[in-house]
Amino acid sequence: MRLSTRRRVFLLALCLVSTGCVHRIHVAPVPTSAPSNTIPRSLQVTLSPLALEGPDHRPGITFLDWPHRDLTQGILGYLRQRGTFSSVSQEAGDLSLHVAAKLVLSSRRDLYHYRVILEADMRDASQLIKSYLTEQTAVGSSIRWVTASDRRPIEAALQLALEDLMGKIETDRLLYRNHTTRSPS
């Protein structure tokens, strides 16, 4: 069975469109400043699955793949480099920070806007100490042709959100330095 030239071209184009257009995001946010205060405790970091919202306010963003593992590694790397806590890992620590992240893509004035929302709960054992919410936006290009057109603003918005979150946590340092697990009476 021999395929016509038109069919071959169509199948090739279909393969390229279905595989070549997905922007696989890799981020490595870096702290822009040293911590305002340090907390001499170990920190366990856990993340919920990433939520994505596209320009049409529906779940998911067309042609964008941001693996949970990459987001986790990006946040862990940022927290380790910042140096607020004595150690940061996914293993049990003195404190536990659970983060839920959401990326919202919108289009305004012919430019894409990338908003990262972080909801974080700080715990000591199973007891909630404090919750945090931060939202930061970075402006991208007018078109999403290449992966970098998504990656750069996503990384910038994530970095700003992490800076804001850590600033709030560092401001509350006395909560975490003085907090001890209370035994049930």
State what each model feature region is.
Residues 57-64, 125-179:
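Short secondary-structure boundary motifs at beta->alpha junctions and helix caps
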Residues 11, 17, 35, 89, ...:
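Generic marker of residues within folded, mature protein domains
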Residues 1-19:
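Sec-dependent bacterial lipoprotein signal peptides
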